[in-house]
Amino acid sequence: MRTGVIAKKVGMTRLFQEDGRHVPVTVLALEDCQVVSQRTQERDGYFALQVGSGVAKQKNVAKPQREAFAKAEVGLKMKVAEFRVEGEDGLLPVGAAISAEHFIAGQKVDITGYTQGKGFAGAMKRWGFGGLRATHGVSISHRSHGSTGNRQDPGRVFKGKKMAGHMGDRQRTQQNLEVVRTDPERGLIFVKGSVPGTKNSWMLIRDAVKLPLPEGVPFPGAVVEKNAPAKEADAPAADEQKLDDVANEEAVVEEKAADKQTNDTAAPAEETPAEEAPKADDSDAGKEG
């Protein structure tokens, strides 16, 4: 049993297969999904991982949670959930970022979310009741649920009676949904069909509990490598090299300018006696005349 992930519902679209068929899919995005903490048998009595996703503002996170995130050396998370794992082998290191390659195409998953809220709904919309007749004595009770209970015996309304009330916004799990495709570069998971919840709502994605784990699935999970963006890591070194080259060129230019200035100041000093000599001769000639 592997850990699950926390994803955000982006919306629905369709993907075309090689044979020309188009499949309706739900797009789920992994937003900085990281392992926040571990649960071990020695300390907690079971093995599990706490996973966090999203980026939260500091004002929206309580101080104990901020300290826990700082201890784990991860950013502030908007959503945190716990997933049971199979033994110590199923644990991932704290701070590890889970990739979309955690699931493979063709795999079946279970997705948990909160259904869309409908507000206060009547019995016909909430439970599918047929309502009362349009005529024959029915005046203002066309969409009512009809009888509520019995008479003096039992003298009460049974629990669970289907009546009007709040509809939707319930936690539901949809099982055995097929993963059509994954996009690890953008952190997207495409799941066939619909999933419970509205856009921008959080979903918990797990391996299907009623089906065996397919071959080729990474265990204990697919982690984003920190050294993957090699070009970005080499960029500061390249920038420093460029700065050093520019500094060296500026130093060479300054040295050339200083040498030129020295030569310019030294040349007139040598020519001054030659220039002054004729002037002295002219003055002497004037005196003699």
Curated annotation (Swiss-Prot):
UniProt xrefs under InterPro entries: Ribosomal_uL3 (IPR000597), Ribosomal_uL3_bac/org-type (IPR019927), Ribosomal_uL3_CS (IPR019926), Transl_B-barrel_sf (IPR009000)
Record's comment on post-translational modification: Methylated by PrmB.
SUPFAM superfamilies in UniProt: Translation proteins
One Pfam match: Ribosomal_L3
Domain of life: Bacteria
Gene Ontology MF term list: rRNA binding; structural constituent of ribosome
NCBIfam families tied to this protein: L3_bact (TIGR03625)
Family membership: Belongs to the universal ribosomal protein uL3 family.
Protein name: Large ribosomal subunit protein uL3
Lineage: Bacteria, Pseudomonadati, Pseudomonadota, Alphaproteobacteria, Sphingomonadales
Protein's gene: rplC
